[in-house]
Each structure stands twice: as structure tokens, then as C-alpha cells.
């Protein structure tokens, strides 16, 4: 266990639990919820989807890495904060109250048990492998529940004008670049190598580096091995290179044809002093 994931929660908690049945049908474990007594009934609404989240993420990434131990959630006094302490996620008290509104946070912190807790970053320069992956997991869960519309809606909510800088060795370890640009770069990688190769890469990367540490280059090597694609340019442009926002201007022309109309759109990258960026 990484030292930053160690925590002790202490309070006059009341608790309840679900039981998760592992993918192989043999292993099972409790998902236990520890809440302040005054939030006990409301928390059953807030945490109602955790069992489904566990099943869904296990199906996407591979079995929950700590199924021989446990998973749980503990309410703590950090207002709107949350932390993926290993096997017991801390959830700020402001999230608890029967709101059924903070699913993204719950998915994000659970996803860290694959990306960050089980497969840890080799250095803090590789923090994208934690936070970008956990943020994209929110979109993958939305896709699993609501199809492509859910995926698109969730990714649109992650769009920010603060994508400046690199994902590798970022200036702000826990800024929007790492989280939101990180999720978008994974989304782009998915379309660069295709769904089959992308999800197989996630499985292989998890299996290969489970309970150890990995770097961006380790992840890149797995993706290249699975897809048979040279990803040097993709990683150089989107992960190692820091830029201002890459914007586009456009012109269009509509011409009448025998069968109707034909529209020609031309996109121009701005600013133009960067190399031409490749979009899948």
C-alpha cells in the first residue's frame, strides 16, 4: 500500500452493507458504509448504486483488485472532499444527505482502486495514470448505463478551457489539465486504436502492473503491443508536449448540386506556431 493511501477513520458511525459477488462466482466481499448517525437513512439513497458500480467497473477493467479484503465508504469531515484511501474511500459529509447527486465522485474514487491504488504511478510525473484514468472511468460508467449518449454527455461535461500544459510532469499535479485533459486524451486514444485494442490494453496493463507501479511509457508500450500501432506521435503531442489551448477556426462553402447541396468545411489550427496536431 502506498503511504499516501493510509488513513484512520474514527467516529460514532452507524453502518450497513451490500455483498459483492466476484466475476468468477466464487469470491465475495462486503461493501460497507460507515456514516454519521444523523445521516444513516439518507445515506442509503446516496450509496445505493455502489454495488452496481463495483460490478460494472470490474466488468470493464477486470476483477476488483482487493476482493480478498473489502471495499467501503466512510463519511468524514472534509465538506466536499473525497479520497480513495485503499479499500475505504473517504466521502465528505456534504455529499451525504439523500441527494443521490454525486455518482461521479463515487465512481471516480472507486476507479482509483484500479488506477492509483493497485496500479500505482512510478513517480508523481505519472499522476495522469491515476487521475485521468479515474476521470475517464466516470464516462465509461455513464456509457455502460446510458449508452453512447451517456458517454458523450459525460465527456462534454469534462470539457474545459484549461487544457494547457503537459500530462507528464504537470505543473499542477491535481489541476484540470491532469483530470479533464487526461480523460479526453484517453478518449482520443480509444478512437486512435479502436475499442477492441483500447479495452484489451486496459486489461493487459492492469494485469501486468497490478500491485506494483507503472510509468506513462509502460502504459504506452502495452497499447502499442496490443494495437500494433506506433504511438510515438500521439504521446509526444498529447501527453509530453505542453501547449496553450489548441483552437480551430473554420470556413465553409455550400454549393448546389443535381442531388441537393454539398458543404465543404475547412478547419484551421490556431495558433499556427505549433506543429500540426493529429486528432483521431
Enumerate the predicted regions with their spans.
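Hydrophobic helix-coil surface modules that form long, contiguous segments used
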Residues: 1-107
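Active-site-adjacent bridging/hinge elements
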Residues: 25-30, 82, 108-113, 154-168
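Soluble non-cytosolic domains of exported or imported proteins
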Residues: 40-51, 97-101, 105, 124, ...
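Zinc-dependent metallopeptidase catalytic helix centered on the HExxH motif
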Residues: 51, 90-150, 202
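Active-site-adjacent structural elements in folded domains
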Residues: 74-76, 92, 97-101, 165-174, ...
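Acidic/His/Gly-enriched intrinsically disordered linker/tail segments
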Residues: 125-188, 192, 209
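Amphipathic alpha-helical substructures
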Residues: 175-265
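Short amphipathic, basic-aromatic surface patches that mediate peripheral association
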Residues: 267-276
